[in-house]
Amino acid sequence: MPDFLSKNRVSELAALKQKKQRRAQGLCVLEGLRLITQLAADGILPKEVYLLDGEEALPALASVPAFICDQRALDRICDTEHPQGIAALYELPRSDFKGFRRAFYLDGISDPGNLGTIFRLSMAFGIDAVLLSEDCADPASPKVIRSSLGAVYKVPYAQMNPIALKLPGLKVVGTSAEGDTALHAFQPPARAPMLIVIGSEAHGVTPEVAKRCETMLRIEMAPGMESLNAAVAAGIVAHHLWVESLTS
């Protein structure tokens, strides 16, 4: 039978809610049966598992040390208001960024839910990497990992200064409601690496980044709509490019 989680250990795990502590230790606590099951299916196993008394351990995690805790302890170590009956301790996702053929550059995407969703749809639609401005949400935070359903562990990412957007041979395209090129008419380059810039819904692509874009793509919408959620816009663009790659 698993041991009970000690009070001292609960305090140590609760400290990982702070970004500084996560970075210092290279660890984070993730919760939820769906996320932990998906990570296990992807071959990503935790260092420890924490279960409410009466909950059964996952067969896929049979080799992982397990501990029993009460609801109060689970509430302390998890960053959600109503955590489910299972949590686990993971190493932070580490990017093995080497290059890309097609990538997103995220310009000020500060909402963790949007950022996680963009990682997830990047896996679905063949986006090789996600590059981030300095003011984006932390890709290694539990909220981002949870909303990505673990995709942050699979899609390479890196922080990137806008100055690097003008690398030789790199095609950079932005997105804007007032863009000069309709998305459906855009032909992606056959061989050159391409970077697709997604700005925040509130502010769009910043002027510093926009001036480095060769063209601005426009997602055509019904009258009366001014903008889309950043993750929704990213999904529409990524899906269009994915379909184009299948038919070209």
Each model region followed by its residue ranges:
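Boundary-proximal intrinsically disordered activation/regulatory segments immediately upstream
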Residues: 1-54, 136-137
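Amphipathic alpha-helical repeat scaffolds
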Residues: 32, 110-118, 226-232
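RNA substrate-binding interface of SAM-dependent RNA methyltransferases
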Residues: 41, 89-180
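Structured adenosyl-cofactor binding patch, chiefly the S-adenosyl-L-methionine
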Residues: 88, 121-125, 136-153, 207-248
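Active-site/ligand-binding-proximal alpha/beta "capping" segment
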Residues: 174-225
